[in-house]
């Protein structure tokens, strides 16, 4: 395990170095920093993944002292033969796309243009597989021009050189060879600075890894005969809930479907899917408003698609007065009603009640689901909340509820609970678990938080 630790430490050092570079060039905590960090890290990951895989299919490259040089000397036909032999979840890279090639061109004055064109060319070449899309079917490419975020034109080439300098110190190939499973932890570390409050409608409601794991374990249980499973999150954020579910089921046994209105979340979700060997699900990761324009539909395009497992950690309160009437015009979907627009404090509109209804509507007849809700929902005596409660209890859909510790979520001090649904409606009793006192307190900046320990 010492080797794993060494690679993991080097990976964390790489992330810290990339963040330091952004800081040096005036983009520390800038709104564009996350784009640079996530895309450059992903470029490094895919470059090394490509190198690892091409050496498995080409003896020439495997035995070469410098495989990048040997690859560059091959003919175009040889490259095409290699591409045909690669698994479908491996990106196709030309010699000029490799980190080694960029390293050798750093002395050129227009290196920022070379760097940017390399990134966009890789994205264009792999657009069919390595892209997500909007609800209007616009492809969202893998990479974009990154040096444009440096305001000073004269600093762009040095910035690009500084980024590439950080990418050549080690390779992920050893991690691939030994099947080390630490990229889920690396993703958590990579995005930890960007899961803060603010920034976007349905802002990035990050789910702590421990809670995601608990939800996945309780949903899937000890089921072993799982295959062709479809999992969905209508408020996916960065995908933590879906990744935990896929890991429990088996990444090779399930397909992920996701939607979130946030552009930032979609970029991070893309990275999360790739790091977790779920490239085939990228096409199902949609950026768009789930409530007014749900993307995932049945084959006839009229009804909502239904899934084996549905999970969600939606925003609880939010001003959606601009779209409220459009939502209310869909009474079949929102059968329990839609919260009214208050005269004051529109930001306190209970948008989570709409996501509960959407989750229930998205379950197969034998499907299971789980959703994070404010604990106050459980004792609601009126309004939309009461109608939903009455429905899930009377119809025997809800089978469990866990009250979580306060301050367990980074962005809210609201007490939260997790509801568990089983649409087969076989359960007569609801299991209530009080986990509010579990876990340990820790300091998160100026805030006192609580995190759960791993428990069954």
Segments predicted by a language model, with ranges:
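Non-catalytic, mostly N-terminal accessory regions of nucleic-acid modification and defense proteins
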Residues: 1-214, 218-219, 281-290, 403-406, ...
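A conserved structural/catalytic subdomain of Rossmann-like adenosyl-cofactor enzymes
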Residues: 2-5, 304-456
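Helical mechanochemical/support elements of P-loop NTPase systems and associated helical scaffolds
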Residues: 10, 14, 29-33, 159, ...
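Glycine- and acidic
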Residues: 21-23, 172, 196-202, 251-256, ...
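Generic recognition of flexible, low-complexity loop/linker segments
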Residues: 23, 273, 292-300, 358-359, ...
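Flexible interhelical turns and helix-capping residues at alpha-helix boundaries
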Residues: 26-29, 223, 249, 363
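A generic secondary-structure signal for well-formed alpha-helical elements
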Residues: 44-50, 54, 194, 223, ...
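Conserved S-adenosyl-L-methionine
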Residues: 201-312, 317-328, 373-376, 384-398
């Amino acid at each position: 395990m010492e080797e794993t630790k060494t690679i993991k430490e080097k990976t964390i050092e790489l992330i810290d170095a990339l963040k330091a570079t952004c800081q040096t060039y005036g983009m520390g905590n800038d709104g564009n920093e996350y784009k640079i960090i996530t895309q450059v890290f992903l470029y490094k990951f895919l470059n090394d993944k490509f190198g690892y895989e091409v050496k498995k299919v080409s003896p020439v490259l495997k035995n070469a002292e410098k495989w990048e040089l040997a690859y560059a000397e091959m003919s175009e036909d040889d490259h095409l033969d290699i591409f045909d032999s690669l698994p479908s979840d491996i990106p196709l890279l030309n010699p000029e796309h490799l980190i080694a090639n960029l390293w050798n061109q750093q002395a050129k004055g227009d290196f920022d243009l070379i760097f940017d064109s390399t990134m966009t060319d890789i994205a264009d070449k792999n657009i069919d597989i390595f892209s997500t899309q909007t609800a209007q079917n616009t492809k969202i490419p893998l990479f974009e021009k990154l040096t444009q975020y440096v305001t000073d034109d004269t600093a762009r080439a040095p910035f690009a050189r500084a980024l590439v300098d950080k990418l050549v110190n080690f390779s992920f190939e050893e991690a691939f060879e030994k099947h080390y499973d630490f990229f889920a932890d690396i993703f958590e570390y990579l995005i930890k600075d960007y899961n803060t409050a603010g920034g976007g409608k349905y802002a990035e409601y990050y789910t702590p890894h421990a809670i995601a794991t608990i939800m996945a374990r309780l949903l899937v249980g000890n089921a072993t005969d799982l295959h062709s499973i479809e999992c969905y999150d209508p408020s996916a954020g960065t995908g933590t809930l879906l990744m935990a579910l896929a890991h429990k089921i088996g990444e090779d046994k399930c397909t992920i479907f996701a939607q979130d209105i946030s552009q930032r979340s979609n970029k991070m979700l893309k990275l999360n899917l790739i790091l977790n060997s779920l490239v085939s699900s990228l096409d199902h990761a949609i950026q768009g408003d789930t409530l007014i324009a749900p993307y995932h539909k049945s084959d006839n395009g009229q009804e909502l698609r239904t899934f084996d497992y549905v999970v969600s950690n939606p925003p609880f309160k939010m001003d959606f007065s601009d779209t409220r009437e459009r939502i209310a015009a869909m009474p079949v979907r929102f059968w329990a009603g839609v919260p009214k627009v208050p005269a004051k404090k529109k930001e306190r509109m209970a948008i989570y009640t709409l996501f509960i209804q959407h989750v229930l509507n998205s379950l197969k007849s034998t499907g299971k689901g789980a959703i994070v809700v404010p604990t106050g929902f459980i004792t609601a005596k009126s309004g939309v909340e009461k109608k939903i409660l009455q429905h899930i209890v009377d119809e025997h859909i809800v089978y469990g509820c866990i009250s979580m510790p306060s301050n367990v979520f980074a962005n809210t001090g609201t007490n939260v609970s997790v509801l568990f649904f089983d649409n087969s409606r076989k359960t007569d009793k609801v299991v209530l678990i009080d986990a509010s006192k579990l876990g340990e307190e820790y300091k998160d900046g100026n805030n006192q938080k609580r995190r759960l320990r791993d428990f069954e």
